[in-house]
């Protein structure tokens, strides 16, 4: 079983943890993570955006938020994620998660699941996850992964 399968199977645990973090910092950080991973190759095709928005709406861990609001936020953040200057603002949203280790771990795991709803975890996406780990002061072992 691969890393993505392990994360997907941990859905109930992630949903329970996510309910602890019903705030804007968690919401914005998680969706920023998702957009940054989705934009890892420099583009986000309309089909990929639609698939990610659908995954956002169906993920139990994010049911504490309004699906439409999350989808709209993701679409906005996608534009930011491919613009090098606006990307820095997204990284700041991710860095805000660092003040709560469990929140940061949960957000990164959720972001990885959603952004990789196609089942492909590319080397570019892994590089972005490493950057996100650094931004939050976490390591691969904190997530239980090896990139």
Annotate each predicted stretch with a short phrase.
Residues 1-37, 43-147:
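Small-residue-enriched hydrophobic alpha-helices in membranes
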């Amino acid at each position: 079983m691969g890393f993505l399968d392990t994360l997907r199977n941990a859905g109930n645990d992630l949903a329970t943890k996510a309910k602890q973090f019903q705030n804007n910092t968690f919401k914005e950080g998680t969706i920023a993570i998702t957009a940054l991973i989705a934009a890892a190759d420099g583009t986000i095709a309309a089909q990929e955006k639609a698939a990610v928005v659908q995954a956002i709406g169906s993920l139990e861990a994010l049911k504490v938020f309004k699906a439409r609001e999350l989808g709209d936020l993701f679409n906005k953040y996608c534009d930011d994620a491919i613009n090098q200057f606006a990307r820095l603002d997204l990284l700041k949203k991710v860095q805000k998660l660092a003040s709560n280790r469990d929140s940061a771990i949960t957000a990164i795991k959720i972001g990885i699941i959603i952004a990789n709803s196609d089942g492909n975890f590319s080397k570019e996406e892994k590089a972005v996850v490493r950057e996100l780990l650094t931004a939050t002061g976490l390591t691969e072992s904190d997530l239980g992964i090896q990139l």
